[in-house]
Amino acid sequence: MDQIQVRQIHQVLLGCGFRYTNARDISPDSALRLLYSAAGFYVKSYLTSAGTFDVALVLKDEPFTTLPAAIILQSPEQLKGRLLPHINMGWYLCYVEEKEATWDPNDLEGLLRSVDIQIGLTLNNSVNAVETGLAVDAEMEGEFSSYWLARHTAYLVADVTQQKELNCFVAGTKNAHKTEYQEWVVCDDTTLEERDAWLSQRNLELHDSRGIITRRIRIKPSQLSGVTWPPKTFRAVLDWLAEVDNVAWLHLLEHFIQHPVKRHMILMDVLHQDMIGFRVDLDLGALALSSYQSSSVRRQRKAGRVNYAHLASAVSSKQAVQKFQRVNVVQADRLSVLSRNRRGKESGDLSTKHIALIGCGTIGGYLAGLLLRAGAGCGDKTFYLFDHDEFQPINFGRHVLATTDIGRNKAEALVSTLNSSTHLAKNIKAFTSRFAINAEQLKRYDIVIDATGRPPVSARLASVVRTFKLTERPVLIHGFNDGNGRASKVIIDDGRCCYGCLFANEAFYKDGMDLRFSHISMSAERHISCGSTFTPYDAAVSIITAGIMQEAALSVLEKNARWTYSEHMLEGGRTQKQKLLAAHPRCGICHGNL
């Protein structure tokens, strides 16, 4: 910031009621002093119904595009140590979602005044949520886990909602010379393969092959804000559960009766919040968990009821608890990872389909990664890639592969990249030969994706699938760059139309050429030599084509088709809207003339 801007900010903040405070007049033990080294800060007292909050602004080097941080120096005595919406760690005030917010960066005075108003509103909303308990803390939704302040992270490679027996494994860095790093992975018996892939790709190894028994507890809290948080002991966790959800409290205690072992990982699935967890190690010698009988045994033998209050006191006593650690929980299971970016999650992902990708050139290279991220090859169904060509230095400018792949078969290099990119990859395989276009081969797949850009291949695929019954056909998806890189075009052949139907429409095509490009000398732009043809254009059009082809593959999962033809024009005309392409009466493929 220059001096003019500094003076402008000074005058605006003083006008808003802030006072400039030297750093030496602020406690050196405060988070503000420990984290920020400025000579002074602007501080303002905000009055709420619960009392006064003193808030300091930390101005950034670029005040026009970056909002100042708001640090709470003092809060009302009755709220200290309490969980408050929008206040993290007891001192960091999240008064706006900066990444989602928009403002006029050229009006600095208006921006600072808006920040002042927003801080006041946020503090009042936070206090109001504590005092009234609004709708189980609507102000807290999505924030709760950030106040957990854990030192460790557990990654869930299993879908913990499936009620399977879970185990948590502790892993660390393989290189002994590196700073020791520890990571926890939760899986079940069906996801051990994903666990091993996770560890391998993150260069980790198990510290102990014995897992920590893990249990998910669902919590529907009566309130969140206003409680003492975060809990520093296991007893504090039990006290909190007893206060906000007695049923969850009982389920947790039953877990210890059913599993009288030393080490436990508990995942707390709080309604409308991200999951959090904790690890607790118990001294079994100080307890008598085996003397308690599970609820099912008690029903059968008609034994006396358990004194849960006594059990809670015993299991959380200082003598019983050897270790208590708060843990962040991150979902890394297939369902969570693959469905996150889909609007219609109910239709599933591509892991439920056998898929063949023919052609691993520029379009196929980008498309392969997109299909993987949509689930292809991540389940029991296969994702096979076909290409007979090798990756060469001249391919680098438009291809997703790297210099280390030069000389390798494109399909093999792509499969290596896909398998090493995620722990979810399971059934991905490369074939270094051309795809055999025959009935036996095509019947193996649910979706066959043609990324060759070669009309004879596309036309032959469309013809051969029409020898099948409609219910037995794979869906064909053709994608290609047209107009020497000026357009992306994608066709979905689900039986309504075919590749040939597009070019049979004489209103738009003549001799296989889009009439929008009729004024261009296509051959003059191509470099042709014996056995090869190269057309110079950048990778942008291929990336767009790959993106539309991914959309086409995902649309196959939907009950009702929205389109069978889509295009994007980069140059030479207007882009047509997506449409359901009808079978053309002059199409030789559909009418058996080929």
Q: Model regions: which residues?
A:
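A short, basic/flexible loop-to-alpha-helix module at the beginning of a structural domain
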Residues: R326-I355, G377
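Glycine-rich phosphate/adenylate-binding loop
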Residues: S126, S145-F324, A451-L594
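Glycine-rich phosphate-binding loop and adjoining beta1-alpha1-beta2 segment
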Residues: T382-H423
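Compact alpha/beta protein-protein interaction domains typified by the UBC
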Residues: P28-V96, L108
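Glycine-centered motif in EGF-like
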Residues: E77-D137
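A structured beta-alpha segment of the ubiquitous adenosine-cofactor-binding alpha/beta core
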Residues: A413-D446, T452-V457
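Glycine-rich adenosine-cofactor-binding loop
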Residues: E346-Q392
